Amino acid sequence: MAKKVAIILADEFEDIELTSPKEALENAGFETEVIGDTANHEVVGKHGEKVTVDVSIADAKPENYDALLIPGGFSPDHLRGDEEGRYGTFAKYFTKNDVPTFAICHGPLVLVDTDDLKGRTITGVINVRKDLSNAGANVVDESVVVDNNIVTSRVPDDLDDFNREIVKKLEA
């Protein structure tokens, strides 16, 4: 049975930060499911990419997934704005249980809500690094950072490195 990757997503995601890792994962034989506010609802990226939500966050069970992917753009801000904190709680399952967790650009902001960044080494786009540092993370400026189960990258230019490392992590 193929490993399954949860992708948490809201409107205004950075299109290529969803499509490129999703394609890399699927080409490597992994299954992906998009999780958002409402199943069968369409979310739209910053550049017009349209994606249908497979599973609502209300119905998603983190234990049913082998990894978590959090694309960047403005989507992470919307996810963090969930009044019930469901996306942070969902992500916390992965960080707390050492399940592979992948985040790029603004995506690592969702990990702030897990309260599990203290002492972890991660990266993200420059304008989120202070928030990550304030959450206790050791923030570095590298194209891809692997800290145990967490893989992070900064920007779309880092996608080749990011995709290589997330596939490698799931193949291990």
Curated annotation (Swiss-Prot):
Gene3D superfamilies: 3.40.50.880. It comes from Staphylococcus epidermidis (strain ATCC 35984 / DSM 28319 / BCRC 17069 / CCUG 31568 / BM 3577 / RP62A). InterPro entries: C56_PfpI-like, Class_I_gatase-like, DJ-1/PfpI. Residues 3-171 form the PfpI endopeptidase domain. NCBIfam families: PfpI. It holds the Pfam family DJ-1_PfpI. This is Uncharacterized protein SERP1413. Belongs to the peptidase C56 family.
